[in-house]
Amino acid sequence: MKNVTVLKCASNVRKLEMQMNTRIPRNSLAVVTITLILAVSSWAASKEKVLYTFQGTGDGVEPIGGVVRDAKGNLYGTTRFNFQSSGAPTGFGLVYQLTPTKSGEFKEKVLHTFQGELRDGQSPQSSVVFDAAGNLYGTADGGLFGCGIVYKLAPTPNGPWTETIIHQFNAFNGHNDGCEPIGSLIFDNAGNLYGTTSQGGGGTTDTFCTNGCGTVFKLAPNKDGSWTESILHALHQGGGGSRDGQNPFDSVVFDNAGNLYGTTLAGGPDDLGTVFKLTPVTSGKWTETLLFKFHDLVNNPPDGANPMAGVVLDPSGNLYGTTLGGGGGAGGGGAVFKLTAGANGKFEESVIHRFSLSKSGFQDGMIPAGGLIMDSAGNLFGTTFLGGGHNEPVCQIDGQQVFEGCGTIFKLTPTANGKWSESFLHAFQDDTDGGLPEPDHLTMDAQGNLYGTASAGGKLVQSQNGGFNSFGVVFEIVGAATPAR
């Protein structure tokens, strides 16, 4: 999990391979390569506060998904594993709740522990989402067919939460269902759930996707408590398909007209990913429009490569997102892009920030795998998986040196001349404040505080093999954003 390396950028993106010894964010499938070059960054004073440090016992290991916050200030999230045994993460993952105490600390409660692939799933990798009644919904690997599940957790009056599997994905034996749901879910106003699977959907003629290149799906609740799935769109890549992308890793997002927007990590003409739009039509089907196909070095200037995270919309209908690599910055450390909506329905892409690598301090971030959020002033906030070495070219995770830095939290502010100014709110440094923030986006409360998770780092705990390890943290960045008006 914690062996970190420099990424390499290649046109044939099938898996994200870390060549310095590192763990891949969220089991990504892309291949990115990055070189270390001098860069200059602007740093703001750190405002990070660690709310909870995972101990590697029964409280969870590797909080890969982000957190959501309820009206009482409780935080909810998932961990990929349960505990540390003989020096390695084991168990099938869990869903947790963090409750603030009068002392200002947070107390953890495990809401559900997954039992394994053929039971109720395993290894949740995304955040959860609330419905209006206070139930939680999420996705996990495994299930009866090994393609993943969608689950519901309902609170009971006496305290425990009850799990119900509302869908088992099955992309095998002629089924055109999706497989491997990695992103989080979203609700519409009618209580339907929407999400993506990174594989599946049929498409057996596709050159690169044995069981399909991924899907966008909908789950509709029935009166008897069951849910009915429908595939809104199945992605294709080659073999006579439309080459509209493959491997959607994150959730989709609605605009005010009910259209859905999302990204694919790979696929498209240059196999560097796409941004797509799905429009509902009266027949109940959805029509796909490709808004942008990433080309990176083929374009001048380069436009980025491999968007793992989804997009966020501003009030004008413009889209913003991140790419793992490319972008034309020194070393190609990734990019933040904007797709501007035109009067003719077309979108024009511009790169509003190019991440650059610094051999002397690694000050800028690299690999912005996480999604963005926008505050009421139009500022953008996100994370980078690596980078941010400050004046020290090395940070430590469990005694291992991470030469590029252990990740950053950044802010992009629009300026009067149409450009964007970058500042860094925090650089993860060592085994106290966490490291390697995961691809899920940050969460913002009404006061402008930001919340997120780092899959590694935190206080060192002695494991059963006698070594010392860290298992990740939940953090807060105080007062970073402009509160909603």
Label every PLM stretch briefly:
Residues K2-R485:
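Extracellular beta-propeller repeat domains
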